Amino acid sequence: MSHPLPPNIQEILQLLPHRYPFLLVDRVIEFNAGKYIKAYKNVSINEPFFQGHFPGFPVMPGVLILEAMAQSGGITVLQSFPINELQGKVFLFAGIENVKFRQQVIPGDQLILECEIIRHKLQLWKMSCQAFVNNKLVAEAILTAAMTNKENF
């Protein structure tokens, strides 16, 4: 199913089960459903994780950068299905490869998330993902995700 416009926040909330404080995609900038997405997360000092990571030296945890990339990739995969086909389904991490963190992400940054689907077989998707701040690469990874029935979860 082709979607000519990037999903708005209401559509993102329909696609992803995540909610505050764990929804890590604020807006989709560009996308081609099932192929590519560019989105962003505005990183605010009000994020709950900054209370403990780290007091006096707030740094976004790397695992949350990975999660933001995964949520972005999930949006592009899930947008390729009619919404009624997603009932009873869940989209999960299945693997992470070649993770590199290159720079810290701090309050005030806008984290740009880019994911490209590089392989799809049956219910598995492999994505090449990068995160940028001010056009500088801050993290990259190859992510694998799987779609399964919620009752199998």
Curated annotation (Swiss-Prot):
SUPFAM superfamilies xrefs: Thioesterase/thiol ester dehydrase-isomerase
Residue ranges crossing the lipid bilayer per the database entry: none
Family: Belongs to the thioester dehydratase family. FabZ subfamily.
Catalytic activities: a (3R)-hydroxyacyl-[ACP] = a (2E)-enoyl-[ACP] + H2O
GO molecular function (one): (3R)-hydroxyacyl-[acyl-carrier-protein] dehydratase activity
Protein name: 3-hydroxyacyl-[acyl-carrier-protein] dehydratase FabZ
Biological processes annotated in GO: fatty acid biosynthetic process; lipid A biosynthetic process
